[in-house]
Regions:
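Short, conserved loop-to-beta-strand elements that form functional interface hotspots
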Residues: 121-133, 248-260, 282-291
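Short amphipathic alpha-helical surface micro-motifs
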Residues: 48-56, 105-106, 124-126, 170-177, ...
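Hydrophobic, ordered structural segments
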Residues: 102-156
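Intrinsic disorder/low-complexity detector
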Residues: 2-95, 138-222, 273-295
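C-terminal functional regions that serve as terminal interaction/effector modules
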Residues: 217-220, 239-248, 252-283
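Short, well-ordered alpha-helical segments
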Residues: 71, 76, 85-126, 207-253
Length: 295
């Protein structure tokens, strides 16, 4: 994701010409600029918007963070063409790069909106892909979440900067409940990290198919293909976390989608939230045992 300096200006309830120009350069439309100007903190009669549930909202507030507004990024992307060899396991790097770049565009635009609000981070992020009717090779990549600002004393106090080492608002796909638990445990999110690999799985030879009829047998080329593809996605996600100087990644999800490529071409996508300890001597609180009286 592109490095960007903080553009939120304390006490200023309007977007400056410079801020508007920077957002436009990121691909944020004019309608979004007007909406963001109305959401800026300190504006008389201003409100916040959020896709958090009531429980999530209350727990995020309890953790010491104030919602500023719903932020989003979108990219409608034409995914190029690459054909795998019939009998060979291989990554389709043109498609891998397309899927990765499109998601990066959506995430960067969402981060730019949060930055314009002066947010410290974005919680409850959803990153989705929707295939469109414009064509089988056109998809919309959407990132949406709630921009938040840390209140004094958030995280137990003593934390002066909640942004990551790239000077961007942190991003997290954790639920409001998990975010509260993470902060209480003495950790902070750095950013969502991800890895993508589009992989072509070789077709079996006709003789092998015939020979396996009626047998319990491992299809080794399929096993190796799926193993390799997942490892590539995971290693790329881990590399992003290392670039953020993270201690670890929580809430990892490993997804598999064929999209419109057919049964032998699949995207393996790994995503999670990179985290860091808030202080070197942090202590994880012991969980409280709760016994229900329900029958």
């Amino acid at each position: 994701m592109t490095d960007q300096q903080s553009t939120g200006l304390t006490g200023n309830t309007e977007l400056t010409d410079k801020q508007s120009a920077e957002l436009s350069a990121e691909g944020v439309p004019q309608d979004a600029l007007r909406r963001l100007a109305e959401l800026r903190p300190g504006r008389p009669g201003g409100i916040f918007t959020s896709d958090l549930s009531v429980n999530e909202f209350l727990l995020v507030r309890e953790a010491g963070f104030r919602p500023l507004g719903l932020v989003l990024g979108s990219s409608i992307y034409h995914v190029g063409l690459q054909v795998g060899r019939w009998g060979k396991n291989q990554e389709l790097d043109v498609l891998s790069q397309a899927m990765y770049h499109a998601r990066e565009l959506a995430m960067t635009r969402m981060e730019a909106e949060a930055d314009a609000l002066g947010a410290d981070g974005i919680v409850g992020v959803r990153l989705d892909v929707e295939m469109k009717e414009f064509g089988n090779d056109i998809a919309e990549f959407i990132a949406v979440g709630t921009a938040v600002k840390a209140e004094p004393g958030a995280g137990g106090g003593g934390v002066s900067d909640w942004r990551n080492n790239k000077r961007q608002p942190f991003t997290s796909d954790l639920s409001g409940q998990d975010f509260w638990t993470l902060i209480r445990a003495g950790y902070a999110p750095l950013g969502m990290v991800m890895g993508s690999c589009v992989y072509h799985v070789a077709h079996q030879k006709f003789g092998s198919k015939i020979g396996n009829i009626g047998k319990n047998v491992e299809i080794e080329q399929f096993t190796q293909a799926l193993y390799d593809a997942r490892e590539l996605a995971m290693s790329r996600m881990q590399a992003e976390a290392e670039a953020l100087h993270a201690e670890g990644i929580v809430g990892v999800q490993l997804r598999q989608h064929s999209h419109t490529w057919g049964s032998h071409t699949t995207e393996f996508f790994a995503i999670g939230t990179a985290v860091r300890p808030l202080r070197p001597d942090h202590i994880i609180e012991r969980p409280t045992m709760v016994l229900t009286l329900d029958a």
